[in-house]
Regions:
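Core catalytic alpha/beta fold that binds nucleotide/phospho-ligands
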Residues: 1-130
Length: 130
């Protein structure tokens, strides 16, 4: 999808949302942000890397000690960048020069997340039980 979520009547509040596995995440800031969260899913990541990742990122994966973790780290970087820009994912990932800053997070083992913004952001995680 293209575009960014917004709160009508409150343009000063920027936010982005994501969900995967047992987690839903929402990031708030005073500047535009993009955020993605992914649960590691063993079955699909290798095929997705072959299809979507640049040749350079595929080489990094082939040489990585923990390729699965690196895959989800790269994927969340790309997804959060596209969400920050409001363009979503498109074309071969990792082929364009990126502006801004990416901050990684992981709510628990088996999950990778990233927040992208024009300047470094501080991440504060809060678990809310149903």
């Amino acid at each position: 999808a293209h575009g960014k979520p917004y709160l009508p009547g409150h343009p000063q509040i920027c936010f982005n949302i994501s969900h995967s596995g047992e987690y839903a995440a929402c990031a708030f800031a005073s500047i535009p942000i993009g955020m993605d969260l992914q649960q590691h899913r063993r079955a699909a990541w290798e095929r997705m890397a072959e299809r979507y990742f640049s040749a350079e990122d595929q080489k990094r994966l082939a040489a990585a000690e923990n390729a699965e973790t690196l895959f989800f780290r790269i994927w969340t970087e790309e997804e959060s960048y596209g969400k920050w820009r409001g363009t979503g994912l498109s074309g071969s990932l990792g082929t364009e020069k990126k502006e801004g800053f990416c901050t990684h997070f992981s709510p628990e083992k088996g999950y990778e997340g990233a927040v992208w913004a024009a300047e470094p952001v501080k991440i504060c995680m809060k678990r809310i039980e149903p």
